[in-house]
């Protein structure tokens, strides 16, 4: 498996991946109204626009895009909020560790950006996945209207990186 930055040639496969997730795994856990909103936002132009301000990654298996996820900063200059965004794995690849490796890659990118924690707006069906990856529910960020659960994971922020660098 190869994890790399998303390129323009990946836009159509990523749109298809997002739509398949909305129609498949998420359909059992979310209202039709919420899914319709997600679907409306899953356009090629939307993903191209995101590439300009997010670190968007794809995971390839045998040359095919099988997963995608992004690192976004939804905070302000003085208060960054590093967030996992648009995270999808093709359903036939669930359980193979691809999502886990992609999420670790995104966490490392956040850590490299100086983040001390990583946030994710989890869909209802993915809460267990994120819990296994070290995230916990952040009750301070309710978002029931969008049928998502905000979760947070501590990272090795700059202070921890400095301590590790000082060790022999």
Model regions and ranges:
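Conserved hydrophobic/aromatic "anchor" residues
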Residues: 93, 129-130, 135
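Amphipathic alpha-helical recognition patches that constitute DNA-binding helices
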Residues: 13, 83, 117, 125
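Conserved N-terminal entry element of GNAT/NAT acetyltransferase domains
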Residues: 1-12, 156-168
